């Protein structure tokens, strides 16, 4: 994939504000070695815990992913954006984002230093969070909805300036039910 990222973390809660402020100021946080990676999907830790950039990390930590995009003109770019999706066998997932939110885990996005709220509102906003397996429970019989899968939602519009545009994504790890990572795939609309 052509998306190149610099990832910082994982960081426990007591350092999150410090690291966030440094990154927003364009500084490298003390004591953190950046990880260079590429792709539209960055896996920090899978539900199985055996894969990802930080497979041994426990809930309560946060990671940041940063990239830049060039735009020849000021305008709107679109991207497929997501942070978790239900396990098809058990439904374990952080759920559909509430209005204005990127996830039910406290995900935040800045474009050129300005925080951006999710402009999309979903009919299932704030629902379908399953922290435990749904086997033998009524939730297991609920049909999946496209809103539960970030790749089936419409692309998200982002306002960009002419030239280099910096995207910073903060992704907390809130529980082992979560497939912890970042998906950000620019698309043409």
What residue spans do the PLM features occupy?
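Short beta-strand/loop motifs in extracellular/secreted proteins, especially
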Residues: 75-77, 105-107, 180
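Surface-exposed beta-strand/loop patches in extracellular or lumenal glycoproteins
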Residues: 77-82, 96-98
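Surface-exposed intrinsically disordered loops and tails
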Residues: 126-149
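Accessory carbohydrate-binding/adhesion or oligomerization-edge regions at the termini
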Residues: 1-61, 68, 84-90, 98, ...
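Extended extracellular/luminal ectodomain segments enriched in beta-structured repeat modules
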Residues: 60-62, 70-80
